Amino acid sequence: MDEEYEVIVLGTGLKECILSGLLSVDGLKVLHMDRNDYYGGESTSLNLNQLWKKFRGEEKAPAHLGSSRDYNVDMMPKFMMANGKLVRVLIHTDVTKYLSFKAVDGSYVFVQGKVQKVPATPMEALKSPLMGIFEKRRAGKFFSYVQEYDEKDPKTHDGMDLRRVTTKDLIAKFGLKEDTIDFIGHAVALHCNDNHLHQPAYDTVMRMKLYAESLARFQGGSPYIYPLYGLGELPQAFARLSAVYGGTYMLNKPECKVEFDEEGKVSGVTSEGETAKCKKVVCDPSYLTNKVRKIGRVARAIAIMSHPIPNTNDSQSVQVILPQKQLGRKSDMYVFCCSYSHNVAPKGKFIAFVSTDAETDNPQTELQPGIDLLGPVDELFFDIYDRYEPVNEPTLDNCFISTSYDATTHFDTTVVDVLNMYKLITGKELDLSVDLNAASAAEEE
């Protein structure tokens, strides 16, 4: 192991694997290590027996739930926007040749105590039971404005500079109601709070356009895609990619200790008495605990069920967003469900997650509004984990630390962190202009 690398990556979570892949493709010499004997770190994927061991402390799950290996339960389940940045990153690295994607059936939102399909186009707005007849027209006009908006063509701006006008002022022009503003901001533009209302509208409009374009791509009921066999496939695909570019992966390396020189800059990583030298370290917060701070906790429930989520048109895979205001909370709640259709459970079984930022000392109670939407469950597990963010100055120590995964069930925030880290590490922006058709292998099935 006494070699020299340009970058050593610690942890095989999604963010670390994507960065390791991007840096390998850029021609850097990368060593990738993990203290665990499995891929994925916090974002690993468990079979049924592993799930049982983690949450129940028993070696084997009951036989009536089916074969353990038919389950691939992602610990950080997140859907990908079909035309989104993550898919572009995957195509950029060509890792898509190791993965098969399938469209997700449904995209729903919880408004006024009901689960409703998220309308994202003028046509859908007119059909949506979310709004009365006059509100439908107003929303339809707003969606048309968004659809036609082109920054380079002032004729589509309606006299507004969206880099200066706030989202609140733009929406006021169309006279939309609170609930409509709520589902547009949280379930279409995928904002996690209401700060966007006081920021320039450009970002929200571009997010809405991305949603509508992704939706149109697969002619399905949602703008999302998900890999067959779940996200656990991603770290392994990146390990294969890294090998193609001469990168090295090592699992089961205990006590990966980051070494520093007299100036406080990274000089290498020691494991089992051997030190690999390097100029930069990329890692998750668990490898450099003295350079991160706690920023909150995520509470989640994991359910095994024998039916799809009620009121979602029997969707075999679905996301339901519960905006904070609808629950009288400070943060949104997310429901994620997947099944045999993505090969993450045996036929007839569904895996559902409910997640949110914990706001009290009783997170199980906080999750109840989301759990209530699931209907009867066969098994229910609760989990809570701390979230951390880096507090170091990477220009001084050459340590590039990812932020812990949040409660969202889509990749929006994750990929923003990855792209920011890539820029810090390399000093350049990642070029995301790619042919999106490269990630569409399985959607015709």
From Swiss-Prot:
Gene3D superfamilies, sorted: FAD/NAD(P)-binding domain, Guanine Nucleotide Dissociation Inhibitor, domain 1, Guanine Nucleotide Dissociation Inhibitor, domain 2
Alphabetic keyword roster: GTPase activation
Tissue localization of expression: Expressed in roots, rosette leaves, stems, floral buds and siliques.
Keyword Protein transport: no
Signal peptide: none
GO biological process, one term: small GTPase-mediated signal transduction
Gene Ontology CC entries for this record: cytosol
GO molecular function, one term: Rab GDP-dissociation inhibitor activity
InterPro entries, per the entry: FAD/NAD-bd_sf, GDP_dissociation_inhibitor, RabGDI
Subunit structure: Interacts with the GDP-bound form of RABA5C (via C-terminus).
Family statement drawn from the similarity comment of this UniProt entry: Belongs to the Rab GDI family.
Role played: Regulates the GDP/GTP exchange reaction of most RAB proteins by inhibiting the dissociation of GDP from them, and the subsequent binding of GTP.
Name the UniProt record assigns to this protein: Guanosine nucleotide diphosphate dissociation inhibitor 1
Annotated source species: Arabidopsis thaliana (Mouse-ear cress)
